Structures are given as structure tokens and as C-alpha cells.
Amino acid sequence: MNLDVGELSTRQLAEKGISKAQLEDRDRSVDLGVEASMRKPYGIISAQALHDVGGASEGTELRLNYQYFWQIDPRLSLIPNVGVEWLSDKRANYYYGILNSEVARGVDAYRPDQVFIPHVSLGANYVINEKVNVFGVAMQKFLPNKVQDGPLVDQSSQTNFYMAVNYKF
């Protein structure tokens, strides 16, 4: 996670009485964690625990996911996924709240504290040949009211796209 102040809407911040000069970028977290998963005929259930060891938020995130692999043909698989993320107070306040240094610059204090963020995604994997495959994901996160009510967020959801090319040596 990270937040680049330059990407925020100047107009929407102004409507909330904030200027970009009062805000700080949020550093990208460096997470260390563990994952456990259970594969069954009806899909995969997985849980992850992450902690920011890089010192950005020093917060924790827990994730719970369910996904199913749907083999369309020998080369193409679709992977629907549904899950939820829990962000600790430190993590949620760092990325979605107002920092103490920003309060000192005149921004009203705001801390959402811990939040749950549900999401859905659809992934696809296409095997090009024995050594190369392409993988992509579209994910939609549904931001809770505690996040939407903050001055840094002006939307009810967040969409992300990922793509990767894998090569087997």
C-alpha cells in the first residue's frame, strides 16, 4: 500500500478545507508474513497475516480468501475470488487517516482505526507453451464508511488490475 498526495484531487481536497501542501505521501509498506491454505474440491481457502517491518505504518493486515479454479480448456483457467482484509489501527490510520504532522499543519484529525475491506476479483491464467504463461487479475475492493468518511478518500470502491508473465527455466 502507498498514497501519493500528487494523485489526490485538488478540488475535492479544497472542498474539505485541505491543500496538498498540508499532506504527506504515505510510504509503501514492506510486509513480512505467513500464509496458510487448504485446497479442497470446492476451491481454496487461504489466510494471510502480514506485518509492516519496513516502518511505514508498523501495522498489521490479516486476509481471508476463497478462490475456485475453473478450467475452461487445457490452456485457460478462470479464478474467481472473494475475501476480506482486516487492517489494524496503525495500518488503517497511516493510509486512510490524517497523520499527527498533518494535524500540526492545520488538517482536522481523522483516524478510521481498524477496518474490514471486502473484495472480489477475477483472475485468468493462459498457458502459451510449456515454459510461458500469462496471468491477470481484476480486483474490486469495497471501502467501508469509516474509510469513505475520511478526507483522503473520495470513492466507495477501488479497482486494481495486475498482470504477469511467467517463464519456467
Q: Could you say what each language-model-derived stretch is?
A:
Residues 98-146:
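Glycine/small-residue-rich hydrophobic helix-like segments
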Residues 1-65, 71-79, 89-112, 153:
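Outer-membrane pore/translocation modules
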Residues 37-42, 70-74, 86-88, 126-130, ...:
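Outer-membrane beta-barrel strand-turn architecture
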Residues 148-156:
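Short, flexible active-site recognition loops that position polar ligands and cofactors
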Residues 30, 60, 116-118, 140, ...:
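Transmembrane beta-barrel architecture of outer-membrane proteins
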Residues 62, 78, 118, 132, ...:
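Hydrophobic core residues within well-ordered beta-strands of beta-rich domains
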Residues 66, 156-169:
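Outer-membrane beta-barrel "beta-signal"
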